[in-house]
Amino acid sequence: MTRPLLLLGALLLAACAGSPPPAAPAPAAAPSGPSCAAALARAGFVFEPAPDRDGPGDCRLRDAVRLSRSHVALDQPLLVSCPTAEHLLRFEADVVQPAAQRHFGQRLARIRHFGGYACRLRNGDTRAIRSEHALGQAIDIAGFDLADGTQITVARHWGEFGPRGAFLRQVAREACSIFHVVLTPRTDALHRSHLHLDIGRWRRCDA
């Protein structure tokens, strides 16, 4: 990946998840530990355990995995907590693949993302609360590639009236049944290029 794209991903992670959603706490996250890693292995995910991290500040990473491949290819490795990866597993199998078949008659081949774990506060603002990215509990999805090479990106296609826009909006709506918070271009300008999916304490669905 080129340096400009890496910088873009870093900036988007710094901007992600604006003010804390004023919603009721979400249910507990999926089980972690050996049972989580076993579920990923059974599903065919390619990953390796990642070391715990403490700090700086309130940042913390536990029971983490570095994914190099999920059910499909990833455009770059993804560092998240194992429970977050398990939610991604369900998201791909139960939401994205069926939506790709419905709108395009073919399978998903690749997920493009801007990252998972990042030690920072919301919006990169020192007055803000800790981001779920700082716990490895969030993923920023930039787009999807289909088996025939068709690319679908949030930045370009979210507002389209055709199948690519309909696909993205369906994926976002149905992600709300798996992830606790789903932020989209409907949320604010900071999310015009990606879907923020997290398993934090709060409930919010901006699909």
Q: How does the language model describe each region?
A:
Residues 1-6:
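Bacterial N-terminal signal peptides that target proteins for export
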Residues 12-15:
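C-terminal motif of bacterial Sec signal peptides marking the signal peptidase cleavage site
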Residues 17-20:
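Bacterial signal peptide processing site
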Residues 23-38, 42-43:
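N-terminal targeting peptides, primarily Sec-dependent signal peptides
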Residues 27-34, 82-91, 162-166:
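Soluble non-cytosolic domains of exported or imported proteins
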Residues 36-111:
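Active-site acidic/histidine clusters and adjacent loop/turn architecture
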Residues 48, 56-57, 62-64, 68, ...:
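Catalytic cores and adjacent binding grooves of peptidoglycan-active enzymes
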Residues 102-136:
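Active-site-adjacent substructure of cysteine-protease-like catalytic cores
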